[in-house]
A protein has these predicted regions:
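Serine-hydrolase catalytic core recognition
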Residues: 217-218, 280, 286, 434-737
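Beta-propeller folds
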Residues: 2, 11-424, 430-434, 442-443, ...
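Generic alpha-helix initiation/capping and coil-helix boundary signal
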Residues: 2-4, 146, 494, 683
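N-terminal signal peptide c-region/cleavage motif recognized by signal peptidases
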Residues: 6-8
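Structural signature of Gram-negative outer-membrane beta-barrels, strongest in the C-terminal barrel
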Residues: 427-428, 549
Length: 737
């Protein structure tokens, strides 16, 4: 009894969280995050880029040597005279591993009172002298700098420009508009696309996307900040409708000439994963049909744009989703690494261009097939996923990568020897590790966390796996009353597949009480909610709700990432069906627990999770008492072509699948309290989803609640994010507790 009272007294003496403490955008959020170390590679050397200076870190003993201070950097830049003051060293760069150079961006005053500019400035921190500066418009976007030539590509008002190191600016295009876009991301950032320009290794040529979207309808977004509200266009190709047409150009600054890759008619095709050959002469591109069930790796002559041939083909009865460009071996330009899920899990394959062959066709996973036009050797294999490639060890001729080979919830750092596929683990084999590698691959910076480790950063020698700890952060929540967070597994609705969950129990949990329970759900592809990192990846809002007496349950259903192709594509052509079956297995598990109040179950999610929340409320109206659906998809025919058709096919080809996932048709099933929340200017799940659902509910005589954030897009940021979670919390307080 004395011991129990002591524990209760300790708990009562600890602090309680506010939403500002727990949410990005909260006024005290950063004060309660684990201590961090901000770093950058300077060639082979690791540098701490701190608030007030930069320090080189000794890999042998972890000691630090000052390279320069913030005040010195501002002095060298002439801050306050020709440019703005740099307020921290967090974002400085070291553009040349062979030179003592530091680079940063400062604001310029513009020439002759012209428009404001930005200046990319390089300083020699040994001599304190400026090496060079590169000025460009302050409103430029899509910045892409070549580390070889130091030329800069950028986009302004949908046109593409190149500025050389010497300051000469050239317009690559002049007819850019909302209908015709140059140098920007295409295909709505699907297929791993993160940018629209691609420098050759020597920096003397620039490949770029040109996207004609004149045939794509404008979705009307509303700007309420004008005296009388106005609309502005948002190009949005919906499933089954016309999509944009993409072509690829190659610009040579020395001649001012552009050639176009002769890829043929771009109608209903996707071009992605653009890669250059090491000799700057060839361009490789992966091309997909609109059905996304066939991909070809194609080679082009960069000088003429001529198509030289297909290197590799891959097809699958559901879909193929290439996400990564080619990685040529630094020691052998005839070989490259290719990533593919052709055998059921994302793995690495070694392609040898020096060994062309008559096309070799092989059967692959789930009735798929591939055709190899050069020799291909699997480099990794197994029922696990390569999550990220980090770089190469040049001396040992190995590749470094992260995978979940040890456990589906983990991420660990390995190196694999290219000549024979021998793998070596480079970390402690626990938790979640992410890394970055120096120039020659001799060291990896290992950033690690686990359910009990807030953050640990080490510098590891890749030759022997020995690491030097640089930081082990204390738990920033040690003075707070933190709920118990556990992790476990249940079986999926198929009866065989393991699904992993996180449970956050109420603060001061009493197993003899019954608690209101909220299921937080996402459930879609390219995301997961549970992993073996700090607090099993628990979100701040879950901690806040546990503090208010709720039990939180989070389950990664089939359809989510990092579990292999079969785990993901089981949802094909009927999104929401298998996902809900798995979530209901979670409900069945919860109902078996004596401390879960089955009469007070709620559900909340955002985006795909908003779709899942609404679907669960309407499909199982007697199970869920309250729900909050954020930015939901309501009808997949209103969603974008690329994502929607990959998982659902076109509405014309899959009418039953689209009908089954159309939540408007279930509007009459609503019994519990459902609040729908959207950003009024959402360009991802456009407002038509939620507004059409409200109309369907009116027609059906049901009563959902609705709230919108004018001016916000798909996600609320800053103080709006705190406001959002205050509203979500209050809804459950009003209707679930």
């Amino acid at each position: 009894m004395v011991s129990l009272l002591s524990v209760l007294a300790m708990a009562q003496g600890k602090k309680s969280f506010t939403l500002d403490d727990l949410l990005p955008g909260g006024s005290t959020y950063h004060q309660l995050q684990p201590q961090n170390l901000y770093t950058a590679w300077w060639g082979n050397r690791l540098v701490e880029t701190d608030l007030d200076g930069s320090n080189e870190i000794n890999p042998k003993n972890g000691s630090k040597k000052v390279l320069f201070t913030l005040s010195q950097l501002n002095q060298w830049l002439g801050a306050g005279e020709d440019s703005s003051v740099v307020r921290s060293c967090y974002n400085v760069e070291f553009p040349d591993g062979r030179q003592p150079w530091v680079a940063t961006v400062v604001s310029g005053k513009g020439k002759n009172g012209g428009k404001p500019t930005s200046i990319y400035t390089v300083v020699d921190f040994k001599s304190g002298k400026k090496v060079w500066g590169q000025e460009y418009p302050a409103d430029a976007t899509a910045l892409d700098r070549s580390p070889s030539s130091n030329s800069l590509a950028f986009v302004r008002q949908h046109n593409l420009y190149v500025t050389t190191k010497e300051g000469q600016t050239m317009a690559v295009s002049s007819d850019g508009s909302n209908d015709l876009v140059y140098g920007e991301t295409v295909h709505r950032n699907e297929f791993g696309i993160t940018k629209g320009t691609f420098w050759s290794p020597d920096g003397k040529q620039l490949a770029f996307y040109r996207m004609d979207q004149s045939m794509v309808p404008d979705y009307p977004q509303v700007d309420i900040t004008t005296r009388i509200a106005t609309t502005y266009p948002c190009k949005y190709p919906m499933a089954g409708e016309k999509m944009h047409k993409v072509t690829v150009g190659v610009f040579t600054p020395a001649t001012g000439r552009t050639v176009w890759l002769q890829a043929g008619d771009p109608t209903d095709r996707y071009f992605t994963n653009i890669s250059w050959s090491p000799d700057n002469r060839k361009i490789y591109m992966i091309e997909l049909n609109r059905d996304q069930n066939r991909a070809e790796l194609v080679r082009y002559d960069a000088a003429t744009g001529k198509k030289e041939g297909v290197i590799y083909e891959e097809e699958h009865p559901k879909y193929v989703e290439p996400m990564h460009g080619l990685l040529f071996l630094p020691w052998d330009s005839s070989k490259f690494i290719y990533q593919s899920q052709r055998d059921g899990y994302n793995h690495l394959y070694l392609f040898d261009l020096s060994k062309p062959q008559a096309p070799q066709r092989h059967k692959t996973f789930q009735g798929g097939a591939c055709e190899e036009h050069v020799e291909v050797t699997p480099l990794t294999s197994g029922e696990w996923v390569v999550k990220e490639v980090l770089g190469f060890d040049l001396k040992e001729k190995s590749l470094l990568f992260c995978s979940n080979e040890i456990h589906p919830l983990q991420s660990n750092i390995y190196k694999v020897r290219v000549k024979d596929g021998q793998r070596t683990l480079l970390d402690n084999g626990e938790g979640v590790h992410y890394g970055s590698v120096n120039a020659d691959g001799t060291y990896v910076e290992d950033r690690y966390s686990s359910p009990t480790v807030a953050r640990s950063i080490s510098l590891t020698d890749t030759r022997n796996g020995k690491g030097r700890n640089l930081l082990t952060a204390e738990d920033p929540w040690k003075d707070y009353n933190v709920p118990e967070i556990t992790c476990g597994s249940i079986k999926a609705a198929d009866g065989t597949t393991d699904l992993y969950y996180r449970m956050v129990k109420p603060v001061d949990f009493d197993p003899n009480k019954k608690y209101p329970t909220v299921i937080y759900v996402y459930g879609g592809s390219h995301a997961h909610n549970v992993e073996a990192s700090r607090n099993y990846l628990a979100r701040g809002w879950e901690i806040y709700m546990a503090q208010k007496g709720y039990l939180l349950f989070i389950l990664d259903n089939r359809g989510s990432e990092h579990r292999g192709l079969a785990f993901e594509n089981v949802t094909f052509r009927h999104l929401g069906v298998e996902e809900m079956k798995d979530q209901m297995e979670g409900v069945r598990f919860l109902k078996s627990l004596p401390y879960v109040d089955a009469d007070r179950m709620g559900v909340h999610g955002w985006s795909f999770g908003g779709f899942m929340t609404t679907n669960l409320m309407l499909t199982y109206p007697d199970v869920f008492k309250a729900g909050v659906a954020g930015g939901p998809v309501v009808d997949w025919q209103y969603y974008e072509v690329m994502y929607g058709e990959r998982y659902m096919d076109r509405p014309q080809d899959n009418p039953e699948g689209y009908k089954g996932s159309n939540l408007r048709l279930k509007a009459g099933n609503l019994k519990g309290k459902l609040q729908v929340i959207i950003g009024y200017n959402d360009p991802v799940c456009v407002p038509q989803h939620s507004l059409s659902f409200l109309r369907a509910c009116i027609d059906a005589g049901t009563q959902p609640d609705f709230f919108t954030y004018p001016g916000d897009e798909h996600n609320m940021m800053g103080k709006d994010r705190v406001h959002l979670h205050e509203r979500i919390t209050q809804y459950f307080e009003d209707y679930l507790k």
